[in-house]
From Swiss-Prot:
A molecular function (GO) term: ligase activity
Renumbered ranges of motif Conserved DDXXE motif: 428-432
Catalytic activity of the protein: L-tryptophyl-tRNA(Trp) + L-arginyl-tRNA(Arg) = cyclo(L-arginyl-L-tryptophyl) + tRNA(Trp) + tRNA(Arg) + H(+)
Species of origin: Aspergillus versicolor
Functional pathway: Secondary metabolite biosynthesis
Domain notes: The conserved DDXXE motif is essential for catalytic activity.
EC number: 6.3.2.-
Keyword Ligase: yes
Gene for this chain: avaA
Name of the molecule in the record: Arginine-containing cyclodipeptide synthase avaA
Keywords: Ligase
Segments traversing the membrane: none
Amino acid sequence: MTATVQHTVKTEVCLRGDVASQPISDSKPPTWVAVLQQHEYQSSVTYHKLDDNRLIPDVFGYSYLRDIADQGKKQSTGKQHARVIQAYSKIHSLLSPPWKSSSIDSNTKTRENKGSPVILEDKRCAFIERLEPPPNSKADIVSTVFAQVNLQTPTGPPLEQFLSCRASNIKANDLKNAAEGVRRPITISTGICLFSSRLLGFIPTNGLSVSHDATETVVPPLPYTTVATFYELETCTRMAMTIAGLAVTASTGGTAGSRPIVVRLDVPNLQYYCYPLELLEAGLVSWEYVEEWFRLVDRRHRQVATLLKDTIIHEVRRRNCDVQVDVTSGTIAATQLLRLCVLGRRKIPSVNDMLFVLSWIGPYQAAWREFLAIVDDCQRPKDLRSLALMAYVFEVMYPALQQATTKTKTPHGKGEESSGRPLLIQVDDIAEWRIFDRAEMLLKRFKHRQHGLDPLLVGVFPSPRIFTSEDQGRSTLFLHDPGLKISQTRPPSSGGDSEDHSCVVGPLDIIGQIYGAEVQDTLMRLIIERGLSPEDEFELD
């Protein structure tokens, strides 16, 4: 990795026409991050105050820039930062467009110019992620800029965010329509995995795991744990805050009109059924193992889906707004068939059987027929795992598919409100970028097939502020779960020798240090309510 060059510049980016650009001040508050390191017997956490350009300590490939400068090169950090800011500014303008001058007040003879009630601030800071290819690979280094974009909401605490965005689908006419008061349906999609790879003993998307010497397939223990993992807690927190910023902006800006802002949570279960079935087909586990695995996954699905839903609603209501949150169920026909065959008949249905019931049974059948019609034959799923992965893309696209199949009025209809292009916002970890890319590609085919029905897909990917220390690859709590007992060597408020302040903490303690005591207390209450606290361990349904 090359050293980070320090720059001191003045901000020239004005995100809103009614907000004057201000120079960067040396007094702006620092950013705190936590770094988790795994050791032989116990993981540890250290906290770092980022108040200058620097590498994030012990986190390979990650750095922090306090003042971004445009270096004049197309792929420079400054250029990438500017593109992220421009993308989020477009999304912000769609959700809460600059209000036109109001009519002249008959009493005061004055005209009031109103701006967005949610103020967007470009802090000219960023996290930089540089992923180097594996040894002997010809792939390029992939750099991602997560720009710091803070939101000041009319009520409630401000939101400090580091985001990467994709908004190239937003056209000038979309912004023009928003400024003229054209309303549009808004759907925010997000997702979360279950457990962690450490608890599962495998990576769900990779399939069968093998031993270290690659001589035998690993059969993981059944996931009986009832305690929320660090990954689940941190993901709920990060996604909830980003979604709250978008939902509050849209609510106060009025861009959704009388329609509720809908948040759809894609919490997998079909994806987690695949692994034990592959073990069963390999003759490594019994039917009883598979049945118990299904039961435990179903329980975790209910708990984590409710935890994420409640966390989002809490963060939105802290800012005096509301939102409709639904858990997706687009694969319900397939999961019901799978459960019937496996639990009732001890048979594994074929992938063609699964595709048939998705296309012809249940409330989502028309959407699935529309979806599969735009999927190339070579991309159609050949096994259960590839079908489960395809379902992620379906769920992101579902609001558009539903509009096509139910013949919802288009912008040219005569509904009670004029309607712009439906806005689909994917809020997810940057590791899920492939879902966005594939949905974006399929939506272009969808537009051609639907004679102009043109949903507007954008992506918002929040960076974590709790990092894992790895030799290579992306920092991720799912793959590198530090466990529930972590040695804290340097609390943010401490001074002097870190050994004097050593103690054992849990995930919620670390989340509280980074995101605040209110977030920590809320999560503690919610995990107790949902049976995900340490006190619930070993208590089975």
